[in-house]
Amino acid sequence: MIMSQKPFDLEGYRKYITEKVREAFNVAQEARAKGLDVSDHVEIPLASDMAERIEALIGIKGIAQEIRDLSSRMSREEVSLEMSRRIAAMFKDNRKEALDKAIRVGLAILTEGILVAPLEGIADVYIGKNQDGSEYVGISYAGPIRGAGGTAQALSVLIGDVVRRELGISRFQPTEDEIERYIEEIESYDRIKHLQYMPTPDEIKLVVRNSPICIDGEGSEEEEVSGHRDMERIKTNRIRGGMCLVLCEGLVQKARKILKYTSSMHLDDWNFLANLGGKAEGKSSKKSDKFLKDIVAGRPVFSHPSRPGGFRLRYGRSRVSGLAAASLNPATMYIMGKFIAIGSQIKVELPGKAAAVTPCDTIDGPTVLLKNGDHVKINDIEKAREVYDDVVEITDAGEILIAYGDFLENNYPLPTPSFTVEWWEQYLPDGVNAKDIDQFSAVEISRKYGIPLHPYYDYYWHDISFEDLEFLVKNAEQWSITEDGMRVPYPAFDVFIRLGIEFRRSGDYLIIRDYYPLLISLGYDVRNGKIVNVKKYERKGSVMETVNYLSGLIIKPRAPTRVGSRLGRPEKAGDRKMKPMVHSLFPVESYGEARRSIIGANKNSEGSYKAEVFFYRCNSCGFETPTPVCPRCGGHCSPLGEKTGSIDLESILNRAESILGISLDSLKEFKGVKKLMSKEKVAEPIEKGILRAVHDISVNKDGTCRFDMSDIPITHFRYREIGIDERTLADLGYEVRDVNELFPQDVIIPRKAAKYLFNVSRFIDDLLVKYYNMPPFYSLESEEDLIGHLIIGLAPHTSGGVVGRIIGFSDVNAFYAHPFFHAAKRRNCDGDEDSVMLLMDGFLNFSARYLPSTRGGLMDAPLVLSVLINPDEIDKEALNVDTLSRYPVLFYEAAERHASPAEIEDTMMTMKVRIKKTGTYMGSSYTMDTSDINSGVLVSSYKTLGTMDEKINEQLGLAKKLRAVDADDVAARVISTHFLPDMYGNFRKFFSQEFRCTKCNAKYRRIPLSGRCQKCGSTSLTLTIHKGSVVKYLNETLKIAENYRLPDYLKARIDNLARTIKETFPDTEEEEKPEPREVKITGLDMY
């Protein structure tokens, strides 16, 4: 796939991608045309832009050009509403169809034709009757509407209203009972699922009473409402999750945004929205502990909200941050118990809810206190490894680098900035050397030019009290200057820790090497080797003001904003396996037993069994079979349809062995599925499953092979760090230089992914050669040969894939790609994960006919493929990524007054502004370099620690080390949000559980009176919830309660539960991992 050539420009790159996609498509089309698959054509339509994606997704021919024409002069939202009007007019003879098509097209435009929400998020659109006999429009929402996001959810209701008006249908008139039902239902849903924003009862009443459209939904939850049941116009008593999402996270939470559109379109019926959403959309710069909600055992807290010693906010963007990802020094990752790895998700206090972690070794690492009493800063990972076992306390977590664009995206007021070198350098007059600044020149430059003191010699004065400051001022004259530095008596220890001053412990003294700026800040100087007072102490308005007064210098706050955080999900990079692992989408019913073995099914059924499957009839011999080619005579078959019939598995397997030249005896395992979940019950050609078993790869629900990874961004790369040489770099169309800007569809995959995709490529080649009788497509000799080949990226909640090109490999367990690539998949980098597949695998093996017919079955399937990325058609978050090489002083001044980030967007040159001003998104930069994108912890210790006991010990042990963490609070939260709910829940379920047959997996609410499985006759029936599941956290809970200071009410809950469990299960001992215990049952012996 690699070709030697001149460097690409953007147009040449896009042309190259298009040609390679078409080349692969044509090969797959030739293979499919042979009639050996469930369809005779490639089932992933190619789309060059959003308009084509929408046309392919919704299936209305000819609308793509209309969408393009409107998009050239209207905003996305305006296009959505206008196209909805046009679609309604197109189908005006059938009002229900007009409503349905118009709303789905409008929603598809809002979601860029990528999400499945327009297909599955709207369960139904209907016309109902009001009590006065007039008609109204109802939209029934389903769970997948969540993926559309709040704004699109709300606008879909608005679209319904616009179309309703066009069709002359009246507005919805709810009854008081119906309004009360909405309130009860939403409150219940929030208790079960936790809404992002929970409206007040008055807000719910306001929306339901005034919305011209009935916001309805299908019953999505098992729980039913207790009151307001069996209502005429609400068809279910179950909680309607889709309705709750649209009303709360859509209309109420996004009320201000929706008002902009209703006002411009003079839709006065929606003016009531002005009374909503005030609390929902406002962001506050005050500290918040929301990120501490639902702490999980084993996943540590790194800092409580805004607490001294926590992560210090540093503004800027590394080449691997932005789009919600934040960067940490690799040393920080290591010192934090190795819990934070590259790609790990951390829940954060600001500006959003979470961030994926990437490395940046040009920002500050942590400051730690060692066993020998030394207080040192650790800025490189090698030093972190060296001192790791000697760390007594982590007094400062180091810096967290968060990009301006993330504050802009979240509309979060800019918090007070830390004073940093890149800010300080902009105060420096031209001609003054900014390098090699020592403690004496730092003070001299500040005095001479009237600029702030260099941040390296600035301390956390804002973290100490007046009493602390006065203690230092009072005792400074007793300190002494030596050859090693300044000797300070030990009592200053605590204050120095809070100030972040590095020192070396020597007996009863602390030795400070860079002492001069400290003395100056306290109103002292050094004369003839002696410390002398030069400014009389006088208390000012704050400690910072007093230090500025004493020093006579400008001293900026070093770290005024601290960011609380905890570990969310650990990083992920692994091949996707269905549970249990499956090689072939071929039904074995109960004959394959618990392991779903196809070979076992052949033996147990003696070669033939009945199954519900799509059948074909041979055109030559008339034999009926679930395969498109006759297993008896090899003739082509015609489709019959779905039915319950007899599968001649032995003939099918014999023919497959003959065609492929593979003996089934050589396979370690060969697994199918118990039943087919698709609408038509179409089975996959079994030859594909055999070849997957040979290459040890698993099939996904849609016939493809996937590799799942956490998403992290990258805009610039060094060729050496991605495992390629200069020749390969040039062959890929890049200039040979140290750092290159990444083309938007180029990706860097983990080496684990390379190994898996290499195996998939060999499977594809075998499939082409042995099954389709065609030449191989890949012919790879090693994993490195994957470079230059194309993949499809696909996010779980979407239905549109994006083409990418592999240009290298990383050592991390995450997926490096351009922000535009992630955004084209409707993903950001706050801990999201998604998958890739080889392009030819998708073309050759995907079929929509394999997809489950259940709600959400169309999600995570490449129903359409975007060949090229257009910045105008991707999620707008990627356009908020900033591109400057240095943030200007204007930015820092805006942050000092907590300005809205939108005020300075033009100055900050976001991708959006860059495209507007220059016509291209290429040529971007970053503020902080990273020497190697692989530098840092590669696997979180959360994944390497064995038992839960070990994880909790490490979690709480780290909490004790961190100055910014309250270990007692962490212990209490772990128990109250994880252990107790788990034990209470399993205790209740234990007494209302099902029983399971270990042979065929059949489940029973009660044990059959015969004591045998009614499906297979086995007597091996077992519990589904074991005693060990109930008591597994009990001992750990009691241990924590004994060693940490917990609230009295929590101790009482623990004591009550422990007593109940021990009375129910005498002689209880903790069972961390209970093994399923087979229960042999005969008759009523169980009782």
Swiss-Prot record:
Reactions accelerated catalytically: DNA(n) + a 2'-deoxyribonucleoside 5'-triphosphate = DNA(n+1) + diphosphate; Exonucleolytic cleavage in the 3'- to 5'-direction to yield nucleoside 5'-phosphates
Pfam family for this entry, one: PolC_DP2_central
EC number: 2.7.7.7, 3.1.11.1
Superkingdom as given in the UniProt entry: Archaea
GO molecular function: DNA binding; DNA-directed DNA polymerase activity; single-stranded DNA 3'-5' DNA exonuclease activity
InterPro entries, alphabetized: PolC_DP2, PolC_DP2_cat_dom, PolC_DP2_central_dom, PolC_DP2_N
A biological-process GO annotation: DNA-templated DNA replication
Keywords tagged on the record: DNA replication, DNA-binding, DNA-directed DNA polymerase, Exonuclease, Hydrolase, Multifunctional enzyme, Nuclease, Nucleotidyltransferase, Transferase
Similarity-based family: Belongs to the archaeal DNA polymerase II family.
Subunit: Heterodimer of a large subunit and a small subunit.
Alphabetized PANTHER family for the sequence: DNA POLYMERASE II LARGE SUBUNIT
HAMAP family registered for this protein in UniProt: DNApol_II_L_arch
Function: Possesses two activities: a DNA synthesis (polymerase) and an exonucleolytic activity that degrades single-stranded DNA in the 3'- to 5'-direction. Has a template-primer preference which is characteristic of a replicative DNA polymerase.
Protein's name in the database: DNA polymerase II large subunit
Record gene name: polC
